[in-house]
Amino acid sequence: MIKKSTKRMEKIKGPAIFLAQFMGEEAPFNDLPSLCHWAASLGYKGIQLPTDPRLINLAKAAKSQRYCDEITAIVADAGLEITELSTHLQGQLVAVHPAYDQMFDSFAPKELRNNPAARTQWAIDQLKCAAKASARLGLKAHATFSGALLWHTFYPWPQRPPGLVELGFEELANRWLPILDAFDEA
């Protein structure tokens, strides 16, 4: 059985922009302060902050309130606020169907590639760090993906056997409930 979270957002923050789609090697897209000033110049009030190591040290944010205060200050200096952290790439790696292993390996750190079990554990740990970091940043929402465990069932051929989708969702619940619990506990 899947538990429902009882925490709710009190208000919507924004307009906000998802920074991951604009990150690059050249200014103003190559660091957090520059990205924030760029977003503010376009009229945005908030940012969805990707947990990319070029923008935030997720493990440090999970452990250090001072570091989170520094990140918040960088964002506030541009006149913005963080609406949520995002762990889209890590979330995808929580539940990868074996048929997609090779395609999704590039989302993981190089030292974890070709090791699905280590990659999955890293992704779970990242999400749990994100839960703690979100709490330290005072965030009530989080953006992620749930993985590619069931993608092959969207347009199946040949027909899938009875119970396959239910089994897939049970496995997603087994993997995600500890992560969601970490958000509730943070």
Question: Locations of the language-model features?
Answer:
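Conserved beta-strand positions in the central sheet of alpha/beta enzyme cores
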Residues: Q48, E84-S86, A143
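Active-site acidic/histidine proton-transfer and metal-coordination neighborhood
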Residues: K3, D77, E81, V94-A186
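Short, flexible/disordered intra-domain loops and linkers
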Residues: M23-P28, N57-K63, P161
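Non-catalytic accessory regions flanking glycosidase/transglycosidase catalytic cores in CAZymes
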Residues: I2-G14, P33-L42
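Glycine-rich, proline-tolerant flexible connector loops at the mouths of alpha/beta enzymes
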Residues: L49-T72, G91, S146-F154
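Short, acidic/polar
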Residues: E26-A39, Q121-K132
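Catalytic domains of carbohydrate-active enzymes, especially glycoside hydrolases
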Residues: L32-P53, L137-G138
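Boundary/entry segment of secreted carbohydrate-active catalytic domains
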Residues: R8-F29
